[in-house]
């Protein structure tokens, strides 16, 4: 599964093992992939002033323990996530309701986690 920036930030905010919650919902282990462009977005956030910078640094630490998906892509992250998901056949995991709606509109399978830690598998 391909993790987006909002999901990695949510891992920090929630303080919970949301990956295990997703595995319980799916009934099988998952293999999280973090695209290099998501890491780039987190690095940009970590370098800025404000409350998000600390969360972004912590999200980068979490992401460092996962497999990086090297794409060499640049540009608008959400659109690149759509392309990656369609090319690889992996769902995108997000807590961003706007992205979730866009993914569904584009025919991309996604796993949406809301703030109450409810997991929805959507196609």
How would you label these PLM feature ranges?
Residues 1, 32, 111:
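Residues that recognize and position ribonucleotide moieties
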Residues 13, 23-27, 86, 104:
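Signal for well-folded cores of large energy- and translation-related assemblies
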């Amino acid at each position: 599964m391909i993790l987006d920036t909002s999901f990695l930030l949510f891992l920090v905010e929630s303080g919970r093992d949301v990956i295990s919650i997703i595995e319980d919902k799916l009934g099988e282990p998952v293999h999280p992939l973090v695209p290099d462009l998501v890491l780039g977005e987190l690095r940009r956030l970590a370098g800025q002033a404000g409350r998000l910078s600390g969360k972004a640094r912590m999200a980068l630490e979490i992401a460092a323990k996962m497999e990086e998906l090297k794409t060499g892509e640049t540009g608008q992250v959400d659109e690149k996530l759509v392309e990656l998901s369609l090319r690889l056949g992996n769902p995108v995991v997000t807590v961003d309701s706007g992205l979730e709606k866009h993914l569904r509109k584009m025919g991309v399978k996604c796993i949406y986690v809301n703030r109450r830690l409810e997991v929805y598998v959507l196609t």
